[in-house]
Curated annotation (Swiss-Prot):
Source organism per UniProt: Influenza A virus (strain A/Grey teal/Australia/2/1979 H4N4)
Miscellaneous: Major glycoprotein, comprises over 80% of the envelope proteins present in virus particle. The extent of infection into host organism is determined by HA. Influenza viruses bud from the apical surface of polarized epithelial cells (e.g. bronchial epithelial cells) into lumen of lungs and are therefore usually pneumotropic. The reason is that HA is cleaved by tryptase clara which is restricted to lungs. However, HAs of H5 and H7 pantropic avian viruses subtypes can be cleaved by furin and subtilisin-type enzymes, allowing the virus to grow in other organs than lungs.
Regions of this protein lying in the Cytoplasmic compartment: 549-564
Lineage, opening ranks: Viruses, Riboviria, Orthornavirae, Negarnaviricota, Polyploviricotina
Extent of the signal sequence: 1-16
Name of this protein: Hemagglutinin
Superkingdom of this protein's organism: Viruses
Length: 564
């Protein structure tokens, strides 16, 4: 019986540690049942209340024709379009921001090669339009407008419509041709010209009389001289001969000279180059749709405000930067500590040191109290706004950092790529590795700052309350204060809004503190009571056992023999 009484006293005493009957006020922060894990400088897994994904992984499976102008080459690549191959007439006069080359594009005319194909392709793509200016060329005593069965247009033998195939005259003559064109305009001119390589010496003399032929094209700053390479080659569209196409840019005030004794594929004019255009080219099989997007990749369009993407390295327009990571989360809320279940017999409350509060929905920080009038919860808007102000704009600042640095690095790498083409892939891989690391580091820095800021605001709120209460309350060590005076809801509100006057309650608090401390059982007293209770219980059990044995012996129920 005594043990039961002592046990009840201990339970009551243990419960009174959580709530003594004095008012309690706790500081806490918002929490959710399931937060989001983010990475910081010091920890790979930190749970926060809210976070924003920064890496776009969703793609529109089509190319958007607005706001960027797209030109679909269909069966023609951009070089065939510039040469005027059959089937490319739809590209005459075309203008674009992005020229779409299809993997299914095919050559449809006389077989050719371009020794500096990628450079010509880049010049044409960057120019953003096919603005062809026809010119008159005076070729003497030669036959013009050569045609080929390999180049059908409407089932009739034809040729590249931007070029003029010169062969010997009907009188079997191909005299030296020397023709000069001066650029008197205010723009640069692009001339595309070619050299025919026959398959046999007989073909050479049948077409040009002279063997070998020669083509020399010069400007004030450059000269290209080509001697035809005569020889048999695999048949392509019925032809074993080939044409090599070259290109020359003539700046304003410069001139171009064509000198040949045979094999020249002459231009019919020039393309006007626009130095102000910033167009490009994209090789993809993705169809053009009716959507709107400023960003295109070889896998489709992106419509996003995220600063990074993990869809394709090839991205054109106003696009997120490509990174290797599939996910980078930016913390937009505080550290998350899910709320524990109610503790104790009397539902004791706890503050931010032990857990967050899932019921705090009007702010990030707030108060809970327990007094004679009941319990309550209220948000603290001042500390909430202070934290939000420091976090707002974090995503925009991150985008500004990445954009500024990316453009600088991009320019440096482009110069390297232009000079050392063998290093192009290595440079691209290095650029992506660098930006993937950069992005991860920037996000980790911002996440660390967010968590530090939100923790700091929580501590500021706690210190603000502690300075108000002073000796009128006791810090319980869990984010709560036990108040040693009567504190109704108005009093609690004054603590929350910073108008609490501790001098008014000082005397009452001191008296109550001493009275409570005088009657509290210390840990030593509890130990003594437990030992006394245990000893008495053991004594009673032994006494009862001995009494039972004596009673049984007297009644003959137990016989006891002692042998010596």
């Amino acid at each position: 019986m005594l043990s039961i009484v002592v046990l009840l006293l201990l339970i009551a005493e243990s419960s009174s540690q959580n709530y003594t009957g004095n008012p309690v006020i706790c500081m806490g922060h918002h929490a959710v049942a399931n937060g989001t894990m983010v990475k910081t400088l010091t920890d790979d897994q930190v749970e926060v209340v809210t976070a924003q994904e920064l890496v776009e992984s969703q793609i529109l499976p089509e190319l958007c024709p607005s706001p960027l102008r797209l030109v679909d080459g269909q069966t023609c690549d951009i070089v065939n379009g510039a040469l005027g191959s059959p089937g490319c007439d739809h590209l005459n006069g075309a203008e674009w921001d992005v020229f779409i080359e299809r993997p299914s594009a095919v050559d449809t005319c006389y077989p050719f090669d371009v020794p500096d194909y990628q450079s010509l392709r880049s010049i044409l793509a960057n120019n953003g339009k096919f603005e062809f200016i026809a010119e008159e060329f005076q070729w003497n005593t030669v036959k013009q407008n050569g045609k080929s069965g390999a180049c059908k247009r409407a089932n009739v033998n034809d040729f590249f419509n931007r070029l003029n195939w010169l062969v010997k005259s009907d009188g079997n003559a191909y005299p030296l041709q020397n023709l000069t064109k001066i650029n008197n305009g205010d723009y640069a001119r692009l001339y595309i010209w070619g050299v025919h390589h026959p398959s046999t010496d007989t073909e050479q003399t049948n077409l040009y009389k002279n063997n070998p032929g020669r083509v020399t094209v010069s400007t004030k700053t450059s000269q290209t001289s080509v001697v035809p390479n005569i020889g048999s080659r695999p048949l392509v569209r019925g032809q074993s001969g080939r044409i090599s196409f070259y290109w020359t840019i003539v700046e304003p005030g410069d001139l171009i000279v064509f000198n040949t004794i045979g094999n020249l594929i002459a231009p019919r004019g020039h393309y006007k180059l626009d130095s102000q255009k910033k167009s490009t080219i994209l090789n993809t099989a993705v169809p053009i749709g009716s959507c709107v997007s400023k960003c295109h990749t070889d896998k489709g369009s992106l419509s996003t405000t995220k600063p990074f993407q993990n869809i394709s390295r090839i991205a054109i327009g106003d696009c997120p930067k490509y990174v290797k990571q599939g996910s980078l989360k930016l913390a937009t809320g505080m550290r998350n500590i899910p709320e524990k279940a109610s503790r104790g017999l009397f539902g004791a409350i706890a503050g931010f040191i032990e857990n967050g509060w899932q019921g705090l929905i009007d702010g990030w920080y707030g108060f809970r109290h327990q007094n004679a009038e009941g319990t309550g919860t209220a948000a603290d808007l001042k500390s909430t706004q202070a934290a939000i102000d420091q976090i707002n704009g974090k995503l925009n600042r991150l985008i500004e950092k990445t954009n500024e640095k990316y453009h600088q690095i991009e320019k440096e790498f482009e110069q390297v790529e232009g000079r050392i083409q063998d290093l192009e892939k290595y440079v691209e891989d290095t650029k992506i590795d660098l930006w993937s690391y950069n992005a991860e580091l920037l996000v980790a820095l911002e996440n660390q700052h967010t968590i530090d800021v939100t923790d700091s605001e929580m501590n500021k709120l706690f210190e603000r309350v502690r300075r108000q209460l002073r000796e009128n309350a006791e810090d319980k060590g869990n984010g709560c204060f036990e108040i040693f005076h009567k504190c109704d809801n108005n009093c609690i509100e004054s603590i929350r809004n910073g108008t609490y006057d501790h001098d008014i309650y000082r005397d009452e608090a001191i008296n109550n503190r001493f009275q409570i401390q005088g009657v509290k059982l210390t840990q030593g007293y509890k130990d003594i009571i437990l030992w006394i209770s245990f000893s008495i219980s053991c004594f009673l059990l032994v006494a009862l056992l001995l009494a039972f044995i004596l009673w049984a012996c007297q009644n003959g129920n137990i016989r006891c023999q002692i042998c010596i």
